[in-house]
Amino acid sequence: MQNMNFKRKLPVPKEIKEQYPLTAALAQLKQDRDTMIADVFTGRSDKLILIIGPCSADREDAVLEYCDRLAGLQEKTADKLILIPRVYTNKPRTTGEGYKGLLHQPDPEKQSDMLEGVIAIRRLHTNVLANTGLSTADEMLYPDNYRYLSDLLAYVAVGARSVENQEHRLTASGIAVPVGMKNPTSGDISVMLNSILAAQHPHTFIYRGWEVDTTGNPLAHAILRGYVNRHGEAIPNYHFEELEHLYNAYAAKGLENIALIVDANHSNSAKKYREQPRICKEVLHSCRHSEHIRSMVKGFMVESYLEGGSQKIGEHIYGKSITDPCIGWADTEKLVLDIAELI
């Protein structure tokens, strides 16, 4: 294979977990959080979930400070909200160019180092849990890599570019925590619902060189993130009519645990990141006017960091996104407290 250079064999997930293990106390903390989060998706709890954090987790110190502040907000809103830090360590790139995340580049200004990356992502997710008591969310960009973090993640997202992929769907069917399926960039919600259907059913397939059986994931659910029309324009899909339509399509499909997370950024905001608080509040307004919508909406995804906006790699502004722009901490704190007040 002349076009592919096999540089070195990486440790398998079992080896990485043995080298960087979870303590029994952290494993129990994670399990307790898993139960609380599952109760939201099954309807046993009426709390809302906020999957919130930077577009990309680019440096450990800033992410840990952000999550420490988030833990303080969790204490203030514990009766209303469950906060799940968004610690995204691998990033899909539309053209294949640009920063691909901590997994690829533990140092954004250096070349890729996948061995160091595997260690870095496990260390970061572990440290967030150990330092703050908050278990984390990440995107499943590469299904084969999920096992490196399977004992740590409280929430898994499948992105708009991956949601039609069979390997993502089948792997999601073997995950024991909620997996959110985003609508594709075309906006076709039938694709998203078919992905949820596949993830909720058992399968047999090849995974990491093994023949595996899965039991299905009843916590697989929908994420609306807006879409792009044929003219390249961003079209939102969080308005009342779209939410009612999704509920009806969801119910007609006969899926378990009808549930939706609304992504307040991406095409829903046309990447105008300051719109995220307004979008969350509009969805909450819709919840007050429809019992169907209220029962379906389980929370939001918000892109947020210590500093608002974004920067180019190499500018070295601490706590500011090097990928998509995010709201800063003051706006984050206000949004979280406002949501808790409104529900």
Q: In which residue ranges do the predicted regions lie?
A:
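Short acidic, Gly/Ser-rich segments with clustered Asp/Glu that frequently serve as metal-coordination loops
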Residues: C55-D58, N257, N265-K271
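Internal helix-turn-beta structural module
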Residues: Y305-I343
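Glycine-rich phosphate/diphosphate-binding loops that line cofactor/substrate pockets in enzymes
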Residues: A38-D46, A251-N257
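N- or domain-start disorder-to-order transition segments that initiate the globular core
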Residues: M1-R44
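Conserved phosphate/anionic-ligand binding catalytic regions in large, soluble enzymes, centered on
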Residues: I49-A62, D324
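Active-site-facing alpha/beta catalytic cores
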Residues: R8, C67, K80-H245, H266-K271, ...
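Conserved, mostly hydrophobic/aromatic
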Residues: G53, V262, G328
